[in-house]
Curated annotation (Swiss-Prot):
The family this protein is said to belong to: Belongs to the SfsA family.
Gene: sfsA
CDD domains from the UniProt entry: SfsA-like_bacterial (cd22359)
PANTHER family, sorted: SUGAR FERMENTATION STIMULATION PROTEIN A
InterPro entries in the cross-refs: SfsA, SfsA_C, SfsA_N
A UniProt-annotated Pfam family: SfsA
Protein name: Sugar fermentation stimulation protein homolog
A molecular-function term among this protein's GO annotations: DNA binding
HAMAP family: SfsA (MF_00095)
Length: 237
């Protein structure tokens, strides 16, 4: 997935109210842009850090741009825009990059399902039956380690999705939790038990019920991003 039009560069002044970020472009222009990330962005955002953003010329938009990519204090790149994860995964599915999910004959997005009135990111249809795939974007990393973690803030919604997947697996339906790691320099993923114990417990319970857990890494630059490798999943940290 290439960024089109090309991203522009700037530096972060501050992020606030979750969805807003003040930046200064390389040309000295001060802008308030959209921050499309509901998480804490722990260990990612730093005042004065480099940012890359897409600019919109749509007069109906309230904000002139969207924060897409940033650089952590450790020099890693991360994708701010969590909405990119589903598009990346779909691109990888269609290209056959995610080997464990190859062979599907149909793909549907945002399908209603479950006991708690949820929507699954992807339902893949196979001759043997469907597979339900939930996608999460991961950006939380730590100094001196190549292990990323999820979530970066307490997420009841994320735990709910795991419960829904567990219900499917108990009924003999294939259910998959897929972590799309939008952070460079990562080799494995673990649940962030120190941030959300309930989510970590729900993940382990889901696995015990038969839910498959996959993690894939993204090759990321300010020009393009593409899923290119499988990562290890460390359920016990």
């Amino acid at each position: 997935m290439r960024f089109h039009p090309p991203l522009e560069e700037g530096r972060l002044i501050r992020r606030y109210k979750r969805f807003l970020a003040d930046i200064e472009t390389v040309g000295g222009e001060l802008l308030t842009i959209h921050c499309p990330n509901t998480g804490s962005m722990l260990n990612c955002q730093v005042e004065g850090g480099q940012v890359w953003f897409s600019r919109s010329n749509d007069p109906k938009r309230k904000l002139p741009g969207t924060w897409e990519v940033g650089e952590t204090p450790q020099g890693r790149l991360f994708c701010v825009n969590t909405g990119r994860a589903n598009a990346l995964v779909e691109e990888a599915l269609q290209a056959g990059v995610i080997n464990e999910l190859n062979g599907f004959t149909g793909l549907k997005r945002e399908v209603a399902y479950g006991q708690e009135k949820s929507r699954i990111d992807f339902r893949l249809d196979y001759p043997t039956g469907p597979a339900y795939v939930e996608v999460k974007s991961v950006t939380l990393g730590f100094d001196g380690t190549a292990v990323a973690a999820f979530p970066d803030a307490v997420t009841e919604r994320g735990a709910k999705h795991l419960r829904e997947l567990a219900h499917l697996a108990r009924d003999g339906i294939r259910a998959v939790q897929l972590y799309c790691v939008n952070l460079t320099g990562v080799e494995a993923v673990r649940p962030a038990e120190e941030i959300d114990f309930a989510y970590a417990a729900a993940l382990r319970e889901a696995v015990a019920c038969g839910v498959e857990v996959l993690a894939y890494g993204v090759r990321l630059s300010h020009e393009e991003m593409v899923i290119d490798r499988r990562l290890d999943v460390l359920l016990n940290g």
